[in-house]
Amino acid sequence: MKYIVVTGGVMSGLGKGITIASIGRNLKNKGYKVTAIKIDPYINIDAGTMSPYQHGEVFVLRDGGEVDLDLGNYERFLDTELTRDHNLTTGKIYQEVIAKERRGDYLGKTVQIIPHITNEIKSRIRKVAARSGADVCLVEIGGTVGDIESMPFLEAVRQMHREEPSENIVFIHVTLVMEDLQGEQKTKPSQHSVKELRALGLSPEVIVTRSKTPLQESAKEKIALFCDVPQELVISAHDAADIYEVPLEIEEQGLTTRLMKHLKLESSVEDNGWREMVSRMKSTTEEVKLAIVGKYTNLEDSYLSILEAVKHGGIDNGCKVEVNMVEAETLEEDPAEIEKLRQFDGILIPGGFGGRGTEGKMLAIKFARENDVPFLGICLGMQLAVIEFARNVVNLENANSTEFDEDTPYPVIDILPEQTGVADMGGTMRLGDYDAILKDGSLATKLYGTNYIVERHRHRYEVNPEFVDRLESFGIVFSGKNKNRMEIAEIPDKRFFFASQFHPEFRSRPGRPSPPFKGLVRAMCKYNKEKEGQ
């Protein structure tokens, strides 16, 4: 097994995840099987209970793992499927070590950070890498060098560097190069970051610099000199117009070839599919506008996978999608704001929890339904679409979800039976892959090209089966079902009115977009042309 370990310095949020995903993409283009592990030094067991404002979206894996959004980038760039074990946290490591101590696995020894915690970290990394069957395992250590939380993980990979043959492991350090008011790039923070890393016994073989503009030659020379790496291994990862261009920028600087040389990997394969996808993305001329009506709109990372899936749909349809975030509560506070939705070619209601903003979202759904604007609802978005339909078409006054109103006379959305009495929040929802059977002749079947699908879920509430017949008698169709569970709702006489209980965005890939997103963008393009022809 070959390991590429990536650390970060100066500040968090530099883009280590995109860097590691880009390196992995380039290695995959050379014919290698690549997997990736994200280490998060927080004490949480997983990301499932974190606020989107704290940590961005919670990405859901096929096995139900609720993980850091970087794993979403890994899956999209590498076109692979990971598991919950690919996300290590301090909480998971300590939980396992304490469980072993309670069982007596350590035979009465004093349990310490070294060797017990570090051994557990190394064991987890190696087991995940081996099970994946990959040629190369990428390991990203979250946070910033110098953070106390990261110390056990850095010590563990230091030991791995000592234990593995030199041709089996390489260290890459991602750091920030800032510019002063005159535009000169300052390397001192990067130098100090590498110095701090070296104090921990780690010497990076490659330094990747994050900057607004391409790294100047003088800055590259300084970093090479003071950080003791060859100048050709100081790589500029400057801001790109789109993250999918980053693998190409890194490739042009020869990093992939040099990594292969260090790791003694040989390949004559050259897959240009990624380059062709980026070329298609950059050559789009048509543009449409999408409104995402949500409650976490102040931080776009809260809806990262949705934004990427929309982009994938745009690439496939040959058009650029301009996304506008609309705060749902503003629609509640000022109904006049609803009229502003007329400028958009499509409306999307994403998933979420809690009652805040739900009435505003339903106003947006009503607008889309009544004005025949292409609409996509996801998870809570589907539930709210059903509530809106029940209230305004079926005339079930005060219909609601028991999540928001336990005393509603018409609980068209109710808690999953198995969720009744569940006390713990973490890892207890209906999570991960579940299948669905699609109705023949439905929009769902046309989008997917099959009547059997598997998609990822994250929810506690569902459409109440007791109301299905009554709702369908008024024109809504539940075209996807998992036994007696409603997975998809659509209104056939609309341009595009599609809502899913599952999260299709988590399986969307560049070059292989999620069918609902592909269909939404196609409908938006058609609607836009119809409006222009009026």
UniProtKB/Swiss-Prot annotation:
Binding site for ATP: G13, L14, G15, K16, G17, I18, D70
UniProt-annotated binding residues for Mg(2+): D70, E140
Domain Glutamine amidotransferase type-1, first and last residues per copy: 289-530
Annotated positions binding L-glutamine: Y53, G352, L380, G381, M382, Q383, E403, R460
Xref: CDD domains: CTPS_N, GATase1_CTP_Synthase
Binding site for UTP: S12, K186, T187, K188, P189, S190, Q191, K222
Record region (Amidoligase domain): 1-265
Catalytic activity, EC: 6.3.4.2
Keywords: ATP-binding, Glutamine amidotransferase, Ligase, Magnesium, Metal-binding, Nucleotide-binding, Pyrimidine biosynthesis
Catalytic activity: UTP + L-glutamine + ATP + H2O = CTP + L-glutamate + ADP + phosphate + 2 H(+); L-glutamine + H2O = L-glutamate + NH4(+); UTP + NH4(+) + ATP = CTP + ADP + phosphate + 2 H(+)
Binding sites annotated in the UniProt record for CTP: S12, D147, I148, E149, K186, T187, K188, P189, S190, Q191, K222
InterPro entries xref list: Class_I_gatase-like, CTP_synthase, CTP_synthase_N, GATASE, GATase1_CTP_Synthase, P-loop_NTPase
Top EC category: ligase
Activity regulation description: Allosterically activated by GTP, when glutamine is the substrate; GTP has no effect on the reaction when ammonia is the substrate. The allosteric effector GTP functions by stabilizing the protein conformation that binds the tetrahedral intermediate(s) formed during glutamine hydrolysis. Inhibited by the product CTP, via allosteric rather than competitive inhibition.
Subunit record text: Homotetramer.
Annotated family: Belongs to the CTP synthase family.
Function according to Swiss-Prot or TrEMBL: Catalyzes the ATP-dependent amination of UTP to CTP with either L-glutamine or ammonia as the source of nitrogen. Regulates intracellular CTP levels through interactions with the four ribonucleotide triphosphates.
Full protein name: CTP synthase
Naturally occurring in which organism (per UniProt): Methanosarcina acetivorans (strain ATCC 35395 / DSM 2834 / JCM 12185 / C2A)
